[in-house]
């Protein structure tokens, strides 16, 4: 085995792989998005690039979660003979500031980097490389977008390396990620590339089909009857193109159309529009109930209905609970003694693989309640030692798992204390989960990104197996075909070394050092450079007027994600995060500001908290100020869609 050699390397030798060297060489030529399957050592590629760029300046590497950042920091500290510092939310702001100055390599979570840039504790001028792990997250208001813009504006010799297994299934999605990160080339490798093939293990995928139980079919019939009635009303109102076989995407689009009608109506909103919003919200809830019945079973549907009943605050929920079809569906589910046949097939598959000598198995499930049920059942199998692995968010009766507990659970799984990890979507990305011989999907996922991430948990150092459980004639089949289609579409974007995607060049983006000659297109690389320029935030932002005195602004921690703080920092305002007893902003110690959107304002009026907040604001500050933001004050409509509570 040939080992990687460099004066800055230390610790155990690292295998030098041709594809890692080739991808790194391409990344050194210009800011690049490296797209490789999970398990092919994207972190080692980043190390290759770091070794060259450390001669020119410092390096920043980011990962979206603290456990993944810790994993990167541990690897780099073992491998590099330079000072590596880990900066996460567990390190206080006061302690982080000197570490920014002392470290040659900083590994951090993007939220910490964003906050430290806004408050002026971090400067990126002398960073010669910034690495964005899980780069596909660089969309919308995610911190990666702001950090990339600030880096491009301030760095003397900027170079960006984005890393992901799945950049997006459409050209527009990939363009957005690359533009947001100031990336001008894409370097992709997969099992079709000759320099990768020796390191790829085959993964066998098997689709395991089960029938829908008769009891679930009866419940589905009740819910479909209700859904057809609700969608029929939306169709008659011109909000849907058809009254039946309506997807969740179509229902969400109907909601956007209704919100547009609200804004257009101004203060004189017809009562029918509000009623239709409730109908649309009910249809979304019924759609999730149908999905639960078909893919999970009557037990999970009853759990969803019970939680809805306990939190029946919205008008849509109250109306739905009174519908005769909904009531009948609950009666039918309560009478049912059938378990979903997926559970029995899962038991059989796990028992079969354990008997064959498989040491570790990961089972992915969409819903926490199902994950708990699976752990309970699997624990009864001989030699099975299952453990549930879920996200940090709390649900009613389920507090979730802290990052400390998550890390301990994964260590026990790695050590063999547990041999079956039953994980929700938290196990797909951003955590150091050991590779396994077998991965089981309890249900297909419609997202190509999630499909690739789940499948990437096997087939790393040995051949792997993937089982996907599918209930026939249900939404499971639609999800399967959706993810497969999107994955094939993603592959077609980069095939054959053709210039499939055109993005703004660095000169067009307005940053860095223009005028460099473009490198030739190589196998697996996509040149980016001829599309119409996508306007950046800084293009449309008025230049800040220099103030006679420096304005100092304290921002409550809860307001940082809003994007206002980063906009103020862009305009030259010194921003400091703090814990304010009242309000969202404090200007020069005198002016206290409470910021509310139209929905916040109406909500605080309805729950009676508005006047208490205003009174406290007046008592606390010399100059109290209430800012109402947005143009929907007279038209905003509050309703909830609580299906997401099932996830994670």
Over which residues does each language-model region extend?
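Conserved helicase ATPase core of P-loop NTP-dependent helicases/translocases
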Residues: 92-99, 385-388, 392-424
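Conserved helix/coil segment N-terminal to the catalytic DExD/H
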Residues: 91-126
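Conserved helicase ATPase motor motifs in RecA-like P-loop NTPase domains
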Residues: 37-40, 136-137, 156-171
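Single conserved hydrophobic/aromatic residue that forms the stacking wall/gate
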Residues: 637-648
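Helicase motor interdomain insertion/brace
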Residues: 42, 143, 147, 174, ...
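Conserved Walker A/P-loop ATP-binding site and its immediately adjacent core
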Residues: 43-45, 58-76, 168-170, 368
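Conserved segment of the helicase C-terminal RecA-like domain
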Residues: 457-482
């Amino acid at each position: 085995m040939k080992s990687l050699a460099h004066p800055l390397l230390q610790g155990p030798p690292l295998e030098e792989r041709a594809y890692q060297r080739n991808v790194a060489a391409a990344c050194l030529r210009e800011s690049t998005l490296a797209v490789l399957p999970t398990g092919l050592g994207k972190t080692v590629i980043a190390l290759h690039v770091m070794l060259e760029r450390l001669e020119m300046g410092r390096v920043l590497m980011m990962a979206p979660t603290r456990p993944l950042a810790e994993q990167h920091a541990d690897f780099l500290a073992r491998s590099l003979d330079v000072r590596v510092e880990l900066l996460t939310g567990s390190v206080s702001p006061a302690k982080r500031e000197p570490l920014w100055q002392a470290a040659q390599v900083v590994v951090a979570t993007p939220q910490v980097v964003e906050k430290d840039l806004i408050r002026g504790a971090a400067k990126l001028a002398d960073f010669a490389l910034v690495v964005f792990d899980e780069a596909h997250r660089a969309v919308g208001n995610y911190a990666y977008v702001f950090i990339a813009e600030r880096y491009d504006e301030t760095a003397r010799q900027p170079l960006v390396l984005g890393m992901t297994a799945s950049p997006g299934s459409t050209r527009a999605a990939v363009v957005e990620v690359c533009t947001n990160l100031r990336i001008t080339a894409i370097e992709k490798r997969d099992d079709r590339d000759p320099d990768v093939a020796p390191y790829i293990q085959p993964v066998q995928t098997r689709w395991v089909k089960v029938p829908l139980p008769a009891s679930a079919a009866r419940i589905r019939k009740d819910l479909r009857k209700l859904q057809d009635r609700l969608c029929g009303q939306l169709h008659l109102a011109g909000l849907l193109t058809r009254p039946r076989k309506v997807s969740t995407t179509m229902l969400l689009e109907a909601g956007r159309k209704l919100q547009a009608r609200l804004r257009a109506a101004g203060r004189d909103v017809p009562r029918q529009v509000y009623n239709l919003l409730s109908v649309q919200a009910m249809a979304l809830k019924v759609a999730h109930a149908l999905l639960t019945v078909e893919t999970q079973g009557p037990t999970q549907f009853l759990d969803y209905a019970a939680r809805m009943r306990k939190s029946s605050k919205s008008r849509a929920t109250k109306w739905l609970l009174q519908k005769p079809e909904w009531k009948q569906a609950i009666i039918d589910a309560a009478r049912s003694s059938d378990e979903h046949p997926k559970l029995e097939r899962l038991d059989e598959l796990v028992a079969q693989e354990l008997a064959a000598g498989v040491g570790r198995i990961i089972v992915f499930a969409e819903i926490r309640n199902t994950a708990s049920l699976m752990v309970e059942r699997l624990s009864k199998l001989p030699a099975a030692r299952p453990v549930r692995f879920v996200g940090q968010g709390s649900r009613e009766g389920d507090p979730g798992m802290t990052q400390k507990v998550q890390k301990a659970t994964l260590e026990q799984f790695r050590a063999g204390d547990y041999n079956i990890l039953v994980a929700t979507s938290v196990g797909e990305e951003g955590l150091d989960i050991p590779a396994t011989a077998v991965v089981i999907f309890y249900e297909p996922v419609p997202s190509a990104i999630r499909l690739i991430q789940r499948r990437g948990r096997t087939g790393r150092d040995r051949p792997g197996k993937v089982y996907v459980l599918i209930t026939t004639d249900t939404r499971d089949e639609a999800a399967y075909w959706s993810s497969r289609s999107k994955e094939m579409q993603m592959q077609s974007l980069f095939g054959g070394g053709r210039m499939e995607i055109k993005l703004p060049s660095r000169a067009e983006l307005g940053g860095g050092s223009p005028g460099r000659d473009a490198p030739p297109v190589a196998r697996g690389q996509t040149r980016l450079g001829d599309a119409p320029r996508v306007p950046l935030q800084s293009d449309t932002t008025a230049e800040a007027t220099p103030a006679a005195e420096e304005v100092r602004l304290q921002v409550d921690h809860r307001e940082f994600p809003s994007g206002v703080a980063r906009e103020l920092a862009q305009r030259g305002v010194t921003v400091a995060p703090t814990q304010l007893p009242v309000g969202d902003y404090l200007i020069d110690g005198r002016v206290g500001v409470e910021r509310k959107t139209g929905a916040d304002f109406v909500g605080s009026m309805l729950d009676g908290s508005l006047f208490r907040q205003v009174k406290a604001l007046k008592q606390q500050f010399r100059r109290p100020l209430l800012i109402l933001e947005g143009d929907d004050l007279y038209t905003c409509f509050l309703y909830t869609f609580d299906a997401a509570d099932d996830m994670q």
